[in-house]
């Protein structure tokens, strides 16, 4: 039970950090594209941040 709680804690810790990086990348993309962000880019950034958070949590235990 403890390892599961620890992994969830790490996931919730690294998730917001990844999302903040995603927001920074989105801001840079907005500057390049003249302020336009497509729905596809938003979904891609969110999905990549989730995957990065999971990978960081798994690499911590591996």
Curated annotation (Swiss-Prot):
Residue stretch(es) of the prosequence: 23-44
Signal peptide: 1-22
UniProt-listed GO biological process terms: defense response to bacterium; innate immune response
Domain of life from the UniProt record: Eukaryota
Record's GO cellular component terms: extracellular region
Predominant location category: secreted
Keyword hit for Signal: yes
Protein's cellular compartments: Secreted
Alphabetized UniProt keyword annotations: Amphibian defense peptide, Antibiotic, Antimicrobial, Cleavage on pair of basic residues, Immunity, Innate immunity, Secreted, Signal
Pfam families to which the protein is assigned, alphabetical: FSAP_sig_propep
Tissue: Expressed by the skin glands.
Biological role stated in the UniProt entry: Antimicrobial peptide with activity against Gram-positive bacteria. Has been tested against S.aureus (MIC=37.5 ug/mL), against B.pumilus (MIC=75.0 ug/mL), B.cereus (no activity detected). Does not show activity against Gram-negative bacteria (E.coli, B.dysenteriae, A.calcoaceticus, P.aeruginosa) and fungi (C.albicans). Does not show hemolytic activity against rabbit erythrocytes.
Family: Belongs to the frog skin active peptide (FSAP) family. Amolopin subfamily.
Protein name: Amolopin-P1
Species in which this protein is naturally found: Amolops loloensis
């Amino acid at each position: 039970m403890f390892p599961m709680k620890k992994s969830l804690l790490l996931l919730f810790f690294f998730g917001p950090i990844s999302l903040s990086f995603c927001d920074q990348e989105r801001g840079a993309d907005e500057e390049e594209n003249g302020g336009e962000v497509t729905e596809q880019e938003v979904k891609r950034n969110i999905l990549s941040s989730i995957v990065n958070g999971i990978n960081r949590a798994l690499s911590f235990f591996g």
